[in-house]
Structure formats: C-alpha cells, structure tokens
From Swiss-Prot:
Dimer. Might form a homodimer or a heterodimer with PPO1. Might interact with PPAF2 (via CLIP domain); the interaction might be required for PPO1 activity. Belongs to the tyrosinase family. This is a copper-containing oxidase that functions in the formation of pigments such as melanins and other polyphenolic compounds. Catalyzes the oxidation of o-diphenols (N-acetyldopamine, 4-methylcatechol and dopamine). Cannot oxidize monophenols and p-phenols (L-tyrosine, tyramine, gentisic acid and hydroquinone). Binds to the surface of hemocytes and is involved in hemocyte melanization. Activation of the enzyme in response to bacterial lipopolysaccharides (LPS) suggests it may play a role in innate immunity. One of its GO terms (molecular function) is metal ion binding. This is Phenoloxidase 1. The gene is PPO1. Residues 1-50 form a propeptide. PROSITE patterns: HEMOCYANIN_1 (PS00209), HEMOCYANIN_2 (PS00210), TYROSINASE_2 (PS00498). Propeptide cleaved by PPAF1. GO terms for cellular component: extracellular region. Cu cation B binds at H364, H368, H404. Its main location: secreted.
C-alpha cells in the first residue's frame, strides 16, 4: 500500500459512504462495486460523479473476497454500542479478529471499507481503532481523537443545529466557535453539580475511552493479554476515585459514598443533555431514586438478575479471604503478595483473562449495564442504555464514582490482607530528602494556582452530510499555572546511586477539617509524577517541571488539530497512539478554593535496584506510563502500583509523619482557585 495513512480517512464522517470525498485534501476511495453496501451498489457511480468536481484524487481499493460478517450485523446501524454488554463485546471481538487477520494493509483497507459500509458506526470505530493499535504494520498510525469523529458523545446537543447553520451558511474563514455553557446539565440546586466540571471534562472522558481502547477486556489474546493488565485496571480507577474525592473536598462535599446496597434507590439523578447523531435519539436520563431491576433485554441477549451481582460479589470476597481463586479447570491459584491483585483485577472487571468467569462472573461490567438500563430494564419502551453503558460517556454520571468506589473497596479488602511494608522495604539507606518545594510561574512558593480556560475542538470530521470545512465548539475547563518541583537530596551512602522519585499530593485534613488517620489518608493521595534520578555523593538538587509528569498527556494531545499537531518522523509518530492514553495535563491538580485549599505534597526516593524492570524503552512513548503502561513492554516499575500507599501502614503508625522514613519528605502547600476565564486567541 503506497500510503497507509489513507486508512485514517475511514474515521471521517462516520455515516457517509466512503465514495464521497473526505479529509482536507478531498480524497475519495475508488471502491470495487462488490464492497459497497446494497444501497450504493446501483447508484455508486452517480454519487461519485455528483461529487466529481470536489474530488481532488482517488485512492485505489483492492478487490477482495471478504469473509461473511454473520452476527456482527446483528447490531443495527442506528443502535448504540456498548463494550459492557456481553453480546456487543463478543461481536466486537469477532470484527477485531477479522481486521487483525488481514495479511497486509491493502487487504485491511478493503475489509475495513466492506465493514464500514455495513456495520454499526460506533462498533466499526472501536474495532478498527483497536486493530490499528495492535497490528504491527499500522500501530504507528495516529488514530483521530474520538471527540472529532463522534462529537455528540461529549458536546451539548444544542450545539449541532447551530453548527449546521455555521457550516452551511458561513464561509470557512469567517466561522466563529460555538460556545458551550459550563453549566448546561444541571443548576446549583443539585449539589452534585458542583463537580460537573470534573465529571464532564472532555479530557477525562477521552482518557477513560482511550484507556479501554488500549486495554480491551475481550478479543484476541494478543489484544487483551498485557503485562499487569488487571492490576492497572485497579490502579487507574483507584486514582480516578482519589482525584474525584479531592475535587469534592474543594467544593465542600463529603467523600463519594460507595454504592453497596443494589436494591436501594439511587438518590443521584443525571440528565446528560446529549443526543446520539447515529441513532438520532436523546441519551436517556436517570431520575431521582430509581432502583436497579432484573434485566430482560432480549434484543441484547441479556437475562440477568440483580441477585447475580450479589452471588459474584460473595464468591470474590470468599476468594480474597481464603487467599486463592478456583480456576475453571477445578484447580486453585493463590492470590500472592505481588501477583494476586492482577488476578483479582481481571476477575472483577472481568476480562477474558479471568481464571473462572463462570464462577466469579462479570461484576464490574454488568454493574455498568444494570445502572445504564435502570430506566427501561425489560425494553418495553424501546429505550437504549444511558451514559453508564459507554466508556466514552460513563464518567459524566455521578453514580460512576459511587460504583467504582465500591469496586475499589473490593481491591482494598485484598490489599488489607497483605503484609504491611516494613521500614526496610520503605527506606533507602544513606539517602535523605532534605527539602521539597513547588513554585508556580509568577506565584508564591508552595502555592498552586488554578483558573478556568476555554479551548476549541473541531467537530467537522464527525458532522455527516454537511458542507466541508472546520466548525469549532468552545468549552470551558479547569487549568493551572505550570509549576516546578525543587527537591534536595543528600546521598551519604558512599557512592553514586540511582533512585525513583515518587511524587503524590493529598488533602491535609478530611472533609470535616479534622486530622487524618493515615490508614484513611493514604487512599486519597493522587500520583503527580514518577521518574528516575541519579544521585551523586553529597547534596543533590532535583528540578522537575509539572508538564513532564508521568501521569499526563500534553495539553495539545487532548485538544489537538489532527492535521497541525501530528508528530513528524517514524519514532515520534509510532508511539503517538499509546500516548493518547493518559490523564489530561490540564486536570493534573484539583481545583482548590479561592482562599486556598490545604494539601500535602509527598516526595519519596526509592531504591532503583528494587524498582527497575530490565528492558529497552528507547524511542518508546512513556510520558503517561503511570496509568497506561508502555506499549508492548512490561510495566516500567517492579513495585506494586500505588506504592508506598497501597497497603495498610505498619503497626503503631497513625499519622503521615509517623509513616515517613528519611528518604521521604512532606511539604504543606495550598491550591488557590481564581474565578477567571482565559479566552483563546482569535482564529481569524
């Protein structure tokens, strides 16, 4: 194939046939008639001719004999697609395997066109994205951000009628961004709406979607089996809950309440104000005090009782407390100190790496399904699932955090059964952290500054049947002044040493402004950075910028123009996709308060000899490795994820100060929020 980048044009305008010109260069695929859908087989030539003047070049498409799609076509083109629904994930696995099985990119292009013309657009986008990420001959391609293909999953439904007007009537150079209000899903009467800026943030929801793209829980072995995948499921979501709780504290709300009683009413309502442009339907809402019901959704082949969740939960608890799981072959597998959390993660989620899905079930995924169908459990009203049913939208819903607080508590039950870290396991003899401070650009020492910022996103690639050219939506999100860590370390070990610098941020007091017990506080520390340091003998000064964080992806990657910010050159481009997975840089630190929210910055230097994973990562994208790992490599830190806060403290340690060893240090700091909006520069 002369230019495999042409594959990316198949993401553009997902409802339009591929024979219509697409992309900035107005290219059209020259498709053999057999690959077209029945609707266009007879009129394909007329459609091509109609757009002939717009078409600047034709992309040749190889004629192949595609395999039958079979049950993949069971999902109607106008339906919504959910990874959490077993039937949907099964057919997704089949389509991914078909794409992975194509012998070269020419065959892949032909097969993708054949499928795209026939299958559900959401299903196609997911399966084609996973295949591109995992095929050796395509994994260097830069797949479009999901918001640019399906902006309807992220933007207020009122935007699209205004966007059509702008696209149809206004010349491209004179179009102005369509501003989305910050408070469009609820009013201040709803206390949970205080943290809507977090739940509905584009970058956070794109992170969740991209993480599940990189770590699918169904499909071929090569797609699902990744190093410490189950443990990463636990850690990434644990950090999401910790971050959410910090935002709640900044907004005078208590910690999120675990969703434990599944037959009780759910007091939190959610009205998403989203429309599906594929289904031409509004996303269903959940009103106050609805209850979960047994599911009888024949169309989705779901027959499941709420009691099944209880059965699966009890069996998982039994495994945790007995220290082993039963495999589907009838054997036992121990939940060991370092490997047990990975086994448990795959069971709880569950992925097809679960050692016994028949016994331990599908707790996390089906929890999403039960909640997402709460408004129509037996399909009597012909309604689709709510936002909890889609990894691209689930984090918008307040109940997502209640459900994941419960899931995290399961993992904490296991972590509580492990031996506590001894001082020897925490200390680094001869290494003392003597000073820590943070400095914002133009701000006071140990003060982090946050504010509102507006950014634009181009919707045109996801707007079918509209005139070409960019149409921008402008939305308001949290951001912060960049800052730097200044850390001084004394090396009295008698030789040069290497260490891993681990930086966390946590709340100084609980929601009642009382001092923490460390066993509770440790669960609210959010990871800010993790990096290797070389320590000479004597005093060392370490300076690190917040933008270098191992947790986040750069701001430009979340709000990128696909054609302007794509990296140039093989290695940079090769890793761009995996790097698309990561916490958004603009949400690295919590909002804070106008008077200043009191936090504690924790810095630790651990012994690199105990952390090191021997492997080459040269040329590899690892800028967001903490939550996402590294592509085709082992997770780059031998320690348990969340170390040193992932286990209960040793005996007689009740406070953070008592927990510290010489290679750790804590610095009090404040996060100050200023209620101002930074507006982007005019485009014209």
């Amino acid at each position: 194939m002369s230019d495999k980048n042409k594959l990316l044009l198949l993401f553009d305008r997902p409802l339009e046939t591929v024979i219509v010109p697409r992309g900035p260069d107005q290219e059209a695929f020259d498709v053999p008639v057999d690959l077209l859908s029945d609707r266009y087989k007879a009129i394909g030539v007329q459609v091509s001719n109609r757009f002939g003047e717009e078409t600047k070049s034709k992309i040749p498409v190889k004629k192949i004999s595609p395999p039958p799609l079979g049950e993949i076509l069971d999902l109607p083109r106008q339906a919504n697609f959910s990874l959490f629904i077993p039937k949907h994930r099964k057919i997704a696995g089949r389509l991914i395997n078909i794409f992975l099985g194509m012998k070269d990119t020419d065959d892949l292009q032909s097969m993708a066109i054949f499928a795209r013309e026939r299958v559900n657009p959401y299903l196609f986008n997911y399966c084609f994205s996973v295949a591109i990420l995992h095929r050796p001959d395509t994994q260097d391609l830069d797949i479009p951000s999901f918001i640019q293909t399906f902006p309807d999953k992220y933007l207020d439904s009122q935007v699209f009628s205004r966007a059509r007007e702008e696209a149809t009537l206004v010349p491209e150079g004179q179009r102005v961004p369509i501003e989305i209000p910050r408070d469009y899903t609820a009013s201040d009467l709803e206390v949970e709406h205080r943290v809507a800026y977090f739940r509905e943030d584009l970058g956070i929801n794109l992170h969740h979607w991209h993480w599940h793209l990189v770590y699918p829980f169904e499909g071929a072995e090569q797609v699902v089996r990744k190093d410490r995948r189950g443990e990463l499921f636990y850690y990434m979501h644990q950090q999401v809950i910790a971050r959410y709780n910090l935002e709640r504290f900044c907004n005078a709300l208590k910690r999120v309440t675990r969703f434990t009683e599944w037959k009780d009413p759910i007091p939190e309502a959610y009205f998403p104000k989203l429309d599906s442009l594929v289904a031409s339907r509004a996303w269903p809402a959940r009103v106050t005090d609805q209850k979960l019901s047994n599911l009888r959704r024949d169309q989705d082949q779901i027959t499941q009782d709420v009691d099944d969740l209880y059965r699966w939960r009890d069996r998982i608890y039994e495994a945790i407390h007995s220290g082993f799981v039963q495999t589907d072959g009838g054997g036992r597998q121990e939940l060991t100190e370092f490997g047990g959390i990975d086994i448990l993660g795959n069971i709880v989620e569950s992925s097809n790496l679960s050692v016994n899905r028949t016994l331990y079930g599908d707790l996390h995924n089906m929890g999403h399904v039960f909640i997402s169908y709460i408004h129509d459990p037996d399909h009597r009203h012909l309604e689709t699932f709510g936002v909890m049913g889609d990894s691209a939208t689930a984090m918008r819903d307040p109940v997502f955090y209640r459900w994941h607080a419960y899931i995290d508590d399961l993992f904490q039950q296991f972590k509580g059964s492990l031996p506590r870290y001894t001082e020897e396991q925490l200390n680094y003899p001869g290494i003392t952290v003597t000073g820590v401070s943070v400095q914002s650009q133009g701000g006071a020492a140990n003060t982090l500054n946050t504010f509102w910022q507006q950014s634009d996103v181009d919707m045109s690639r996801g707007m079918d049947f509209q005139p070409r050219g960019s149409v921008f939506a402008r939305f308001t999100h949290l951001n912060h002044q960049p800052f730097a860590y200044n850390i001084t370390v004394n090396n009295a070990s008698g030789g040069n040493k290497r260490g891993t610098c681990r930086i966390f941020l946590g709340p100084k007091t609980d929601e009642r402004r009382t001092a923490w017990l460390f066993k509770d506080q440790r669960l609210l520390f959010i990871e800010l950075d993790r990096f290797v340091v070389n320590l000479r003998q004597g005093e060392n000064t370490i300076t690190r910028n917040s933008t270098e964080s191992s947790v986040t992806i750069p701001f430009e990657r979340t709000f990128r123009n696909l054609d302007l910010s794509r990296p140039v050159g093989g290695e940079a481009l090769a890793q761009f996709n995996f790097c698309g997975c990561g916490w958004p840089q603009h949400m690295l630190i919590p909002k804070g308060t106008p008077e200043g929210y009191d936090c504690q910055l924790f810095v630790m230097i651990s012994n690199f000899d105990d952390d090191q994973v021997v492997q080459s990562t040269e040329g590899i994208c690892n800028d967001a490795m903490s939550y996402c790992g590294i592509k085709d490599r082992l997770y780059p830190d031998k320690r348990s994820m969340g170390y040193p806060f992932d286990r209960l403290p040793r005996n007689n340690v009740n406070t953070l100060q008592e927990f510290l060893t010489p290679n750790m240090r804590v610095q009090d700091c404040v996060i100050k929020f200023t209620d101002r909006v930074v507006v982007p520069r005019p485009r014209n």
